[in-house]
Design a protein with these regions (language model features):
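Phosphate-binding/switch loop-helix module in NTP-utilizing enzymes
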Residues: 61-111
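Residue-level signature of catalytic and energy-coupling elements of molecular machines
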Residues: 17, 25, 58, 81, ...
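Gly/Ala-rich phosphate-binding loop of Rossmann-like dinucleotide-binding domains
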Residues: 3, 7, 112
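Amphipathic alpha-helical transducer elements in NTP-driven molecular machines
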Residues: 22, 74-82, 128-135, 172-175, ...
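Phosphate-binding loop that captures ATP/GTP phosphates
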Residues: 6, 11-67
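C-terminal boundary of histidine-terminating zinc-finger modules
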Residues: 203-215
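Loop/turn-to-beta-strand initiation segments
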Residues: 53-56, 91-96, 119
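Conserved catalytic-core segment of NTP-binding enzymes
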Residues: 94-95, 101-201
């Protein structure tokens, strides 16, 4: 949704799905079954990212079957990631958004060593088990040897409001956990997104909720 919003604002946007072991971006962009083509750039063969909704996308999911498990050691995963970064014809971009897997590990280290990152946005649900991973992620980015600015924290699935009781909020996963974490770590709290069925359905069918006028998510990007 963030990528599509930036594209709609006139920005040149790319999305790199760095979740090597569980790629979901092809589904969310309605690109399942797509395969990148090879193009020549300055005499060299490059992968051409697949574009939809004005956003260029690359994912390991383009090269595997939907039911195929990616069982790779860290060095092989890092090599595949570097190929999608450096052996791809991204062209000129204003933003390259990188979807990282939860936690910390080889993938995260490869990214921070390969690219000069402008910043990181940490996403977490409010419950403690999720916040524990988010806290470790923040600590990783703030290490002196990595030193990537944490632009803020977003709380996903903050609360649930049933259609018949739109003014009621039910904090199924806990209340304001990510907001408290942001205060504790002295990083900005960027806001919370509610648990909304239409948002989940939009992701499953590859139609970003921000493009749907009736979506409650669209209002967050106005």
């Amino acid at each position: 949704n963030l990528a599509v919003t930036l594209a709609n604002m006139g920005c040149k946007v790319g999305v790199l799905d760095a979740d090597i072991y569980g790629p979901s971006i092809p589904t969310m962009f309605d690109m399942e079954g797509a395969r990148p083509m090879s193009v020549q750039v300055n005499g060299k063969s490059k992968m051409e990212p697949i574009e939809n909704y004005g956003v260029k996308v690359l994912s390991i999911g383009f090269f595997t079957k939907p039911d195929q498990a990616v069982v790779w050691r860290g060095p092989m995963a890092a090599k595949a990631l570097n190929q999608m970064i450096f052996d791809a014809a991204w062209g000129e971009l204003d933003f390259l958004l990188i979807d990282l897997p939860p936690g910390t590990g080889d993938i995260h280290l490869s990214i921070v060593q390969s690219l000069p990152l402008t910043g990181a946005v940490v996403i977490s649900t409010p419950q403690n088990v999720a916040l524990a991973d988010a806290k470790k992620g923040i600590a990783m980015f703030q290490q002196d040897s990595i030193n990537v600015p944490v632009l803020g924290i977003v709380e996903n699935m903050s609360y649930f409001s049933p259609a018949e009781l739109p003014d009621n909020k039910y904090y199924i996963f806990g209340k304001k956990g990510a907001e408290y974490l942001a205060k504790d770590k002295e990083v900005p709290f960027l806001g919370g997104l509610p648990l909304v069925q239409s948002i989940r359905e939009a992701a499953d069918v590859g139609r970003p909720a921000v493009l749907q006028d009736q979506s409650s998510l669209a209002a967050h990007f106005d």
